[in-house]
Amino acid sequence: MPTPPVSALVAQMGEGPAPLYARVKQMIIQQIDNGSWPPHHRVPSESELVNELGFSRMTINRALRELTADGLLVRMQGVGTFVAEPKGRSALFEVNNIADEIAARGHQHSCQVITLTEEAAGSERALALDMREGQRVFHSLIVHFENGVPVQIEDRYVNAAIAPDYLKQDFTRQTPYAYLSQVAPLTEGEHVVEAILAEPEECRLLQIERGEPCLLIRRRTWSGRQPVTAARLIHPGSRHRLEGRFSK
């Protein structure tokens, strides 16, 4: 189905009493709902919408910001605004492989390894991993992508004594989760979930606007009685949600 030009959509907005930004939102939602703008479709830029619709940049910006906050659009810094995929889901009470979660949605997983180093544990890492300060830990920083869109920063510290070959692995071929499940099978996990505003470097890696809300999961895992890893998992709020079910 060919995508109609923005100028052809103006007539669909109607007059009505609704504020101008709300009418712009409704026009965009209509294009998404009827399939004219499918997931990953590039939305016209603010300048294009201003020129075509004749509304102020402030009006257009508010409409796009609110649709992004609602999870219908994804704004990628320096690239543009796109129709979002339905949000990726993770189980709140489970520890899963992100590559498997993405594959289960019928999508392609890829990743970029930013950091893979050995460090001496500072007080925070030593406490999290139940070790002495100065002991060896491995640090990996990896960005995970779903169909080419960044969906998670994985900032992980690993007890080097438990996984001594961690730095030798090619994590573009298997995730840290998959490797660690082989050498130190998970017996216990801990999740702490927070809403945060991403730091500038995190925004750059996730290709989001500065100050965009993100979901932070602090995860620790054990194999037997020994903590194996402590990780920070950062997801853009517009691209991810957590689900959980429990019985009493």
Curated annotation (Swiss-Prot):
<dbReference type="GO" id="GO:0003677">
    <property type="term" value="F:DNA binding"/>
</dbReference>
<dbReference type="Pfam" id="PF07702">
    <property type="entry name" value="UTRA"/>
</dbReference>
<keyword id="KW-0238">DNA-binding</keyword>
<keyword id="KW-0804">Transcription</keyword>
<feature type="DNA-binding region" description="H-T-H motif">
    <location>
        <begin position="46"/>
        <end position="65"/>
    </location>
</feature>
<dbReference type="GO" id="GO:0003700">
    <property type="term" value="F:DNA-binding transcription factor activity"/>
</dbReference>
<feature type="domain" description="HTH gntR-type">
    <location>
        <begin position="18"/>
        <end position="86"/>
    </location>
</feature>
<comment type="function">
    <text>Repressor which binds to the hutP region in the histidine utilization (hut) operon. It blocks the expression of all the hut genes in the absence of inducer.</text>
</comment>
<dbReference type="InterPro" id="IPR050679">
    <property type="entry name" value="Bact_HTH_transcr_reg"/>
</dbReference>
<dbReference type="InterPro" id="IPR036388">
    <property type="entry name" value="WH-like_DNA-bd_sf"/>
</dbReference>
<dbReference type="InterPro" id="IPR000524">
    <property type="entry name" value="Tscrpt_reg_HTH_GntR"/>
</dbReference>
<dbReference type="InterPro" id="IPR011663">
    <property type="entry name" value="UTRA"/>
</dbReference>
<dbReference type="InterPro" id="IPR010248">
    <property type="entry name" value="His_ut_repres"/>
</dbReference>
<dbReference type="GO" id="GO:0019556">
    <property type="term" value="P:L-histidine catabolic process to glutamate and formamide"/>
</dbReference>
<comment type="pathway">
    <text>Amino-acid degradation; L-histidine degradation into L-glutamate [regulation].</text>
</comment>
<dbReference type="GO" id="GO:0019557">
    <property type="term" value="P:L-histidine catabolic process to glutamate and formate"/>
</dbReference>
<dbReference type="InterPro" id="IPR028978">
    <property type="entry name" value="Chorismate_lyase_/UTRA_dom_sf"/>
</dbReference>
<keyword id="KW-0678">Repressor</keyword>
<keyword id="KW-0369">Histidine metabolism</keyword>
<dbReference type="GO" id="GO:0045892">
    <property type="term" value="P:negative regulation of DNA-templated transcription"/>
</dbReference>
<dbReference type="InterPro" id="IPR036390">
    <property type="entry name" value="WH_DNA-bd_sf"/>
</dbReference>
<dbReference type="Pfam" id="PF00392">
    <property type="entry name" value="GntR"/>
</dbReference>
<protein>
    <recommendedName>
        <fullName>Histidine utilization repressor</fullName>
    </recommendedName>
</protein>
<keyword id="KW-0805">Transcription regulation</keyword>
